[in-house]
Amino acid sequence: MPSRTPAAPAAARKSPAVARTKADSKPARRGLAVGDPAPAFDLPGDDGQRHSLAGLQGRRFVLYFYPRDSTPGCTTEACDFRDREPALKKAGVPVLGVSGDDLKSHAKFRGKYQLGFPLLSDPDHAVAGAYGAFGEKMMYGRALQGIIRSTFLIGPDGRVEAVWSPVKVAGHAEAVLQAVREAAAGKATSA
């Protein structure tokens, strides 16, 4: 069981963009933390585009990892992000969902629930692993390897601004939106 960190790392305390609460935010497994450079990625999306860290340079964005399309928790999480997407877009912050499902499954899932953001395919879990979002987890009392529901707010400088891992779905998208608002306010006041 991962330990909870009572205070954000020193780099995080300098920025109002950090969203840390005992209930929702814990350090990611394998050490990815606030202030760390985000691992590079380049993945295909169900929108026919490739999405990469380099292509998003200079923009703040949400990257969330979820276990599987069309499952109850993943559907709730995706729909919660969908419902907050207008506010996120207003803040200039795109959302990208990532799982190991193929593009056909993603397109079906996105269409069925009218998700306005792309879903990226990471079939070998290499990107999830780089973010600490793949590893051993418990499901129905059994240990297994899989995607650990995790979300990262990546700043315009390519550094991690906030981490939620493992995610509790209820209230999560709202917590992410609040972190985005705080980050935007911090950016506006420091300019």
Please place each PLM-identified region on the residue numbering.
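Chalcogenol-based redox active-site neighborhoods
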Residues: M1-A191
